[in-house]
Amino acid sequence: SYWPEYGNNGKENTTVKDLLTHRAGMFGFQNDYPQTNWNDWHAYVKALEEQKPFRPPGSSQGYHAVTFAWLVGELIKKIDGRTVGEYFKEEFSKPLNLDFHIGLDKKDLHRCAEVSYKRLDNLKPPLDFIKYVPSFLLNKDLINYKETVISKDFLKAFNSKHFDKNGPNSVDWRTAEVPSANGHGTAYSLAKLFGILSNGCEINGNKLIDQKILTEATRIHSKGPDTVLFGSKLNFGYCFMVEQSFSDKLNFAPIFKTETFGHAGIGGSVAFGDLKNKIGYSFVCNRQQKTSNLYKTSNLLTKALYELLD
């Protein structure tokens, strides 16, 4: 066991794969976020160690939007000894000259754009009335959607009251390491990183990771329905979002074509690598759009990119 302190209260059989694929059932905090600053890594880890999962580990997929930071971050720390921010800086940022940081230095605070964001715990799910519709009148996808609306897993995962005091524009948030949610950097650096990964994981003789590892990490290891994201058929590799089957006309989801891997952010930002075309792409923004059009801008850019490639 890499992390024996975690194995209690129904989490004893959690696997590393469960943590990497959003199947640990720990997509939120049972008793809200620890009331401390974001830099108090141990407080968040301890809260997750002690609590029960919302769903049995391995039984279902539920997007661990923020808790992924400490669940996978602590696992990395236990194995390697470094925090995610330290690891990324030493293994990726410095060697590749990337302007991307997990745990921002105070001297760089003036370079950050102000972020406009919306409270998500007050969000009413689309078609909220579906919870009153008898299941025999619904198809399988709508039944999955109904179950997620009733379970309120979305609210458990995205409860953001803690952001009222220390939101995305606070010094506390920007300088802390919350590696699933608060990376700070440029679109160019993200596109560069994914471009290198999409071209053999090597640049100027500098090998980042073994190609076999990336191949394994970017194949589908978990499929929806995702209990947090309203039953969506989201595919995950190890940490990465990978090729999706959503229509490119639906702007509440990002476009991820075959042989692409990357991730999307709740504000509408997207970064991915394309193994087929050997390119990296990134779009970052500082304003959160309406849920129905969350990825509209990025999707328009993605479509334009592939029109050029095709």
What is the predicted function of each stretch?
Residues S1-F27, N31, E49-E50, K78-Y132, ...:
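Active-site helix/loop module of the DD-peptidase/beta-lactamase fold
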Residues L19, L48, H64-F92, L96-N97, ...:
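Alpha-helical scaffold elements that line and support the substrate/ligand-binding pocket
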Residues H22, L71-L75, E177, A181-I203, ...:
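Active-site-proximal alpha-helical segments within enzyme catalytic domains
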Residues Q51-G58, F68-W70, S170-P179:
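Flexible glycine/proline-enriched surface loops and loop-helix/loop-strand junctions
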Residues K118-A187, R219-K276:
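Active-site Gly/Thr loop motif
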Residues V178, N199-E202, T218-D226, T291-D310:
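Short, gly/Ser/Thr-rich active-site loops of penicillin-recognizing serine hydrolases
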Residues I203-L214, L229-G231:
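Short acidic alpha-helical/loop segments enriched in Asp/Glu that coordinate divalent cations
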Residues A264-D310:
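Structured C-terminal helix/loop/strand segments within mature extracytoplasmic catalytic/sensor domains
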